[in-house]
């Protein structure tokens, strides 16, 4: 059984006990539940449901595992022959969600 959900501006294909990494979700602590109710597609053994735009009555229950920062991405600006170099770094924050249950 799997589902395709729309969350935080992106689509994720999820299965039970899977951990997904999404952009940081504010105001939720690790251990809390987050309900994803925008289910686009739901597939059971032989039953498949596609939403228009979302599957009615379907939801995915997740648990917040952790908040963290991704690895550093370096941004370099460089102009040759002008002695101009700038280096900057960025670490994107993320939230790890564990899929507990898929209903629908």
Curated annotation (Swiss-Prot):
Family per UniProt? Belongs to the bacterial ribosomal protein bL21 family.
Q: What is the protein's known function?
A: This protein binds to 23S rRNA in the presence of protein L20.
One Pfam family in the UniProt entry: Ribosomal_L21p
Q: Which GO terms describe its biological process?
A: translation
**Acetylation keyword on record:** no
**The protein's assembly and partners:** Part of the 50S ribosomal subunit. Contacts protein L20.
UniProt KW keywords: Ribonucleoprotein, Ribosomal protein, RNA-binding, rRNA-binding
Give the NCBIfam families listed for this entry: L21
User: Carries keyword Flavoprotein?
Assistant: no
Q: Which molecular function terms from Gene Ontology are attached? A: rRNA binding; structural constituent of ribosome
Q: What is this protein called?
A: Large ribosomal subunit protein bL21
Superkingdom of this protein's organism: Bacteria
Q: Which GO terms describe its cellular component?
A: cytoplasm; ribonucleoprotein complex; ribosome
């Amino acid at each position: 059984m799997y589902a395709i959900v729309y969350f935080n501006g992106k689509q994720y294909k999820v299965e039970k006990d899977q951990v997904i990494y999404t952009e940081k979700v504010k105001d939720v602590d690790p251990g809390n539940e987050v309900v994803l109710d925008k289910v686009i597609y739901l597939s059971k053994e032989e039953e498949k449901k596609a939403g228009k735009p979302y599957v009615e009555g379907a939801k995915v229950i997740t648990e917040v595992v952790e908040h963290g920062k991704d690895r550093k991405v370096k941004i370099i600006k460089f102009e040759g022959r002008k002695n101009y170099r700038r280096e900057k770094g960025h670490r994107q924050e993320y939230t790890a969600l564990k899929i507990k249950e898929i209903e629908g």
